[in-house]
A protein has these predicted regions:
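Histidine-dependent nucleotide/RNA phosphoesterase domain, centered on the 2H-phosphoesterase fold
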Residues: 1-194
Length: 194
């Protein structure tokens, strides 16, 4: 790659395979149910993740430093819970997601550590809004967007709890069929002792 090459990057929690499968199955059930939602394109299970920081287009030369920053942020996470369905963003929704509960507050702590560490090793300026943890399960087809209210869905969200064990730096490509992700660095989260 040339010296000025860039990559579209984000940091996310990897999800256990069974959680990805159940959420994808739920998304397919919602998409197949007639109702108030427009046409949905359900994401493949391997594409599901919990984004913590979207870095945007960054110089490829920063990737090693960003990966090292992930390692420095490794900390135990408490149990997370799948919550209510969300249409995001609320005013002009483009995606169907599920809220993620963080009763112990460990996800917020990890997010804060990442904001500091990632901005210290790059020119990235973080968005200082509080993290609103969610997992995007489906995208609305472009012709069907706009003005959709969050309906009561006939298919309840799965009652799932999980404890993530890895944090990853991903590269994404925007393609006509949807975003494609490549994991380029991975950090195992330190397990809680006790």
């Amino acid at each position: 790659m040339s010296r000025g090459a860039t990559a579209r990057l984000f940091v996310a929690l990897d999800l256990p395979a069974d959680v990805r499968e159940q959420l994808s199955r739920w998304g397919r059930a919602v998409a197949a149910t007639p109702g108030p939602l427009p046409a949905l394109r359900v994401l493949e299970p391997q594409s599901l993740h919990l984004t913590l920081c979207f870095l945007g287009s960054r110089p490829v030369a920063e990737i090693d430093a960003l990966a090292a920053a992930l390692e420095r942020c490794s900390q135990p996470l408490g149990e997370l819970a799948v919550g209510a369905p969300l249409l995001l963003p609320p005013r002009r929704p483009r995606s169907l997601a599920v809220a993620i509960g963080d009763p112990a507050g460990t996800l917020q702590s990890l997010h804060g550590s990442l904001l500091v560490a990632l901005s210290e090793v790059s020119g990235w300026e973080p968005d200082r809004r509080r993290l609103r943890p969610h997992i995007t399960v489906a995208r609305m087809r472009s012709g069907a967007r706009g003005g959709v209210e969050a309906p009561a869905l006939p298919v309840p969200t799965p009652q799932l709890t999980f404890t993530p064990d890895a944090l990853a730096l991903y590269r994404s490509w925007l393609e006509p069929a949807g975003a494609r992700y490549e994991e380029i660095a991975r950090c195992e989260l330190v397990p809680e002792l006790g």
